Amino acid sequence: IDNRKALVFNSGYHANLGIIQALCKKGDLIISDKLNHASIIDGARLSEAEFIRYAHNDHVHLEKILSDNPDRNKLIITESVFSMDGDSADIAGLCELKKKYNAMLYLDEAHSFGVYGSNGGGMASELNLLSQIDILVATFGKAAGGVGAFIYAENNIIDYLINKCRSFIYSTALP
């Protein structure tokens, strides 16, 4: 995807914490799956956005929240494979909801990167949905056996984070 690039963080925790805090402001709405990782919860809490957790993998509940907030900036956040119980999100269904309600989709691929997809690119890659994911975050510390994490997003989002993401700016770079 030509208009995208990546940014590397020290860890998945640093990535989620800083990205969500930097991108979401007062008046915005973060809608997060109930079983999302603590780093996502902490990033949402540190932002000034309203934070609502929808019932795990419940698209009816998610759609109700989306439809009740038509005029707000909305960020849907989910893991592709959930660390809490190992099940998977319906990424195609989430892509449909984000389009229908003019929301952005943030996908944490920590537990699918290096496992799913023909080149280990994660579940969105395997499902051929990568172009529909606004923000993709994954870690090198699980299946890849390394250190750090990354975000893959449009150039303007990456450029913004380089200048505004505190967990990126105020951390020592990886060796």
Write out the residue ranges for each language-model feature:
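Substrate-binding/gating loop at the entrance of the active-site cleft, primarily
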Residues: 10-11, 31-47
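Conserved Walker B
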Residues: 35, 81, 109-111
